[in-house]
Amino acid sequence: MSDSTSSPVAAAPSTAMTRPVSEALLNEKWDRCLSNLLIKSTLGLGFGVVFSVLIFKRRAWPAFVGVGFGAGRAYEECNTSLKQAAREIRAQA
């Protein structure tokens, strides 16, 4: 019987494809945009619920307004971030 530890093991060539810089940057920006949307909308909902309970006699509209403000803020930050990334990519090319 042959001992499998004595035979040299050939290293497999790396087949992992590296993504282009622009695609990796875009993926990073989209991840940040989606996480911002989730966080800011949730914070807006939380503030809306608190104001609804404390000030507005448990009405629903402050919660919806809070979600809208959070989502709007996240959208603007995402838009700015993506435009800045596009400018940087164009400057490099």
From Swiss-Prot:
Q: How does it assemble?
A: Component of the mitochondrial contact site and cristae organizing system (MICOS) complex.
Q: Does the keyword Mitochondrion apply?
A: yes
Q: Which InterPro entries match?
A: Mic10
Keyword annotations for this protein, in alphabetical order, are: Membrane, Mitochondrion, Mitochondrion inner membrane, Transmembrane, Transmembrane helix
Which protein are we looking at?
MICOS complex subunit mic10
Q: What does this protein do?
A: Component of the MICOS complex, a large protein complex of the mitochondrial inner membrane that plays crucial roles in the maintenance of crista junctions, inner membrane architecture, and formation of contact sites to the outer membrane.
Topology in the membrane? Single-pass membrane protein
Q: Which residues lie on this side of the membrane: Mitochondrial intermembrane?
A: 57-93
Pull one GO CC term from this UniProt entry: mitochondrial crista junction
Location within or outside the cell? Mitochondrion inner membrane
Protein family: Belongs to the MICOS complex subunit Mic10 family.
Q: Where are the transmembrane segments?
A: 34-56
Q: What are its GO biological-process terms?
A: cristae formation
Q: Does the keyword Metal-binding apply?
A: no
